[in-house]
Every structure is written in C-alpha cells, then in structure tokens.
A protein has these predicted regions:
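S-adenosylmethionine-dependent methyltransferases
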Residues: 1-175
Length: 175
C-alpha cells in the first residue's frame, strides 16, 4: 500500500478553524495507531462485510479493509482528509466511499447501521472525543476495533466498553 500525505501538518493549521472549534489537522499525521490497526485489519477476512471507519485521517485502516474485500465507508470531519483519502484509494485500487461526518451529527451513519465492523485509530486524543464516541458507538452496531496508544482518559473509556486486547494496542469493544 502506498499513500500520499501532506509534508507537514503544521503547514495546514488554519487559525479561523481553530478559533471556531479548536480544530487542528491531526488527520495529516501518519500515527502509529493507524499503522497498527491497518496491519491488523489486513489479516482479517472482510469479504462482503460492511466496514465503517470513524475519524479516518489518512485512512490506512479503510484502505486495508477495502483491499481485503470489505464495503468501506471512511469518515472524517476534515475536508482535506476526505479528498486525500479519495486520491489514495484510487492510487491503491481500493474501493472506499468517503464522507464528511461529525460525530455530533451522526445521522448518515445511523441510517446505514448496523455496520459489521467499526474501526477507529487514536480517536481519544481529546476528552470531548471520548464523550461523543461513547454515545455514538453503541448506536452503530457490529464489532468495534479501536487502536489506542494509552492516553490517560482512554483507559476509562476502554473499561466502560469492556475492551478486550486483540493485538498490541488494539482492542475489541463490547458495545
């Protein structure tokens, strides 16, 4: 798998977006959790399964799932992330649908639920993300795999969902 990515996330900082919602372009980094989840997903038999990735960023887990035969919807709030993932899917011959979705406005995801598998990598980097994700996940159905590098408040989240380790820093949640 080969992916295009921005040379520097710092160059993508938009002060007006930050002032509006404290938005920073975390999506532009190739995070170890995303790599770990993509590697794990690449070992799964996903032929014909409906897979949703939340906060996809560069979308490596989505690409891996699509290349394993899944019907994938990758979502992020950042328009630039969505556009770059479209290009990377084409570059890798992967069929990935992409959509801009806020977790606080999840109606498009709920209309398509239940999902067979929900993916997320390093989503709990802010406490407000844990709150929104905690409300959303039980409504999506299916199995959830979450890659988490060990942030302090993520531990409470993982306990809340009776997380079971399935690989290094990858957890299956009981939603």
């Amino acid at each position: 798998m080969s992916v295009l990515r921005p040379p520097s996330a710092d160059e993508l900082i938009d002060e007006s977006l930050f002032d509006e919602d404290e938005f920073l372009p975390y999506w532009a980094e190739l995070w170890p959790s995303g790599l770990a989840l993509a590697r794990h997903v690449a070992t799964l038999d996903l032929a014909g399964r409906r897979v949703l990735e939340l906060g996809c960023g560069l979308g490596l887990p989505s690409l891996a799932a699509a290349l394993r035969g899944a019907d994938v919807l990758a979502t992020d709030w950042a328009d630039d992330a969505i556009e770059l993932l479209r290009r990377n899917a084409e570059r890798n011959g992967a069929l990935v649908r992409v959509e801009r979705v806020r977790w606080s406005e999840p109606e498009p995801l709920l209309r398509a639920a239940p999902w067979d598998l929900v993916l997320g990598a390093d989503l709990l980097y802010e406490e407000r993300n844990a709150d929104q994700l905690g409300e959303l996940l039980p409504r999506l159905g299916g199995e959830t795999l979450l890659a988490e590098p060990g942030r302090p408040y993520a531990q409470d989240f993982l306990r809340r969902f009776a997380a079971e380790p399935v690989a290094d820093r990858i957890y299956r949640l009981a939603c």
